[in-house]
Regions:
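Long, charge-rich, low-complexity alpha-helical segments
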Residues: 30-93
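Acidic, low-complexity/disordered tracts enriched in E/D and polar residues
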Residues: 1-46, 89
Length: 93
């Protein structure tokens, strides 16, 4: 899975924010503010990844246990799914 084209991460007034661009400006109402962990996961998803790999990277980068990393990753991915910001490879559908 990966972040759909048309969404970019920008630092605005010291905060990490997801901003729609192009056609997504009309389709997506608003912006999303991310904390540091979510911004880290966003950057991974921009290139494409799977939740298990994201959680593993989160454990290494933030020195947290598997339970916390998996929970945080699942919550973030679910929020992006609800916002319709993710796209999937054929083998993930």
């Amino acid at each position: 899975m990966r972040i759909k084209d048309g969404f970019i991460l920008r630092k605005i007034a010291g905060s990490d924010m997801v901003v729609p661009v192009g056609q997504n400006i009309a389709d997506f109402n608003g912006i999303i503010t991310l904390n540091g962990t979510a911004a880290f996961l966003w950057k991974i998803l921009k290139e494409g990844s799977r939740p298990s790999i994201m959680a593993e990277l989160l454990m290494k980068y933030y020195d947290v246990n598997n339970e916390i990393a998996t929970k945080d990753t699942e919550e973030f991915v679910n929020q992006l799914k609800e916002a319709n910001i993710l796209e999937y490879d054929e083998d993930e559908v």
